[in-house]
């Protein structure tokens, strides 16, 4: 199982070959319901926007819901991050907690999660490439 950040899903949908090559052999794919929102937030406001139709473009990625146990884990991760001087956004703390709960690789395509407190407790792979 591979847990995908919204940045990774977006790059996959943009046909980023580095992301496609890395992910295609690492299914099943999971993400957070928060990441689903982040991906859908991009096209929101465009003509004829339909969130259900947009969600189908990445229907192969199953979403895990955020719950109280994950809220506690997000708080622990945020505490460690603040103490390290690398505070996460609220959403990123919630997403990181969800990823951590799976025990699997967390694949991102930006530098938001390259912090020691996160990398100490989970495997974070960054596929970010300069275009």
Range-by-range predicted roles:
Residues 9-15, 35-53, 76-83:
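A short secondary-structure junction motif
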Residues 3-4, 22-47, 62-69:
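PIN/NYN-family metal-dependent endoribonuclease catalytic core
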């Amino acid at each position: 199982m591979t847990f995908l950040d919204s940045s990774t899903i977006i790059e996959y949908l943009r046909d980023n070959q580095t992301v496609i090559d890395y992910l295609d052999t690492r299914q099943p794919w999971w993400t957070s319901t928060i990441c689903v929102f982040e991906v859908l937030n991009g096209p929101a406001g465009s003509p004829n926007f339909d969130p259900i139709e947009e969600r189908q473009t990445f229907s192969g990625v199953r979403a895990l819901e955020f719950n109280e146990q994950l809220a506690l884990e997000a708080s622990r991760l945020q505490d460690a991050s603040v103490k390290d001087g690398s505070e996460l956004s609220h959403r990123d703390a919630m997403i990181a907690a969800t990823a951590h709960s799976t025990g699997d690789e967390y694949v991102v395509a930006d530098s938001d999660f390259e912090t020691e407190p996160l990398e100490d407790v989970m495997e974070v792979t960054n596929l970010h490439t300069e275009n």
